[in-house]
A protein has these predicted regions:
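C-terminal accessory "lid"/substrate-recognition subdomains
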Residues: 110-134, 144, 165-166
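A conserved segment at the C-terminal end of the G1
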Residues: 1
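Acidic-glycine-rich active-site phosphate/pyrophosphate-binding loop
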Residues: 130-154
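Short amphipathic alpha-helical face segments that pack within enzyme cores
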Residues: 14, 169-175
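A generic structural signal for residues located within well-ordered alpha-helices
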Residues: 74, 92, 165-171
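Gly/charged, well-structured mid-domain segments that form the phosphate/adenylate-handling core
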Residues: 160-165, 175-181
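Flexible active-site lid/hinge loop adjacent to a nucleotide/diphosphate
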Residues: 4-123, 154-160
Length: 181
């Protein structure tokens, strides 16, 4: 209803607490940045869905993070804070992200830009859930049963599939929605 609580960078725990403490807020999508986690925690106790899209070198050397494993450990706190009946969404194309799966104590959904990703295929063959690209379309699957969610051509943010980082974000968001039901 056009109610703005705060403008600007709202990726930290203070912003999350402000947002979640507002009685008008019924649901929230929060970006939880590495620096904010280190300085003030997550800003919430438990979530219904936790998503880790990637782990990259862009923040190494900051806040005592010397290698990708340090950064992965910090980001894994997002998974540990998912409610047991909730869902963790992980990028099957990023081996370091995928290696965090044991830290999740909830249902897992993998996403991948590649329909033949080995981890994704194994997870689906075991009855798991996943979201992937197939023939220029976003597909959501449970076990061996999949359904087309949307063609990439209908998503301008992906530049017709050329902006791979945004395609990956679409897959992650689709997986999060699948996780919510």
């Amino acid at each position: 209803d056009d109610h703005c609580l705060l403008r600007g960078d709202t990726t930290g725990p203070w912003s999350a607490r402000l947002l979640l403490g507002d009685p008008l807020v019924e649901a929230a999508v929060l970006e939880t940045a590495r620096g904010g986690i280190l300085r003030g925690g997550l800003g919430y106790d438990l979530s219904d869905v936790g998503v880790i899209t990637n782990i990259s070198r862009d923040h190494l050397g900051q806040d005592g993070l010397e290698d990708l494993e340090d950064l992965a450990f910090v980001k894994s706190l997002v998974l540990e804070a998912v409610h047991p009946e909730g869902c963790a969404v992980l990028n099957a194309d990023d081996p370091l992200v995928a290696s965090l799966a044991p830290r999740a104590r909830c249902r897992l959904i993998y996403f991948s830009l590649k329909e033949d990703n080995v981890l994704l295929r194994r997870h689906l063959s075991e009855g798991g859930e996943g979201v992937f690209l197939q023939g220029g379309q976003v597909v959501a699957a449970r076990g061996e049963e999949g359904m087309v969610v949307v063609p990439l051509a209908n998503l301008p943010v992906t530049w017709y599939g050329q902006a791979q980082h945004n395609v990956a974000n679409v897959l992650a968001a689709t997986a999060a929605c699948l996780g919510l039901g």
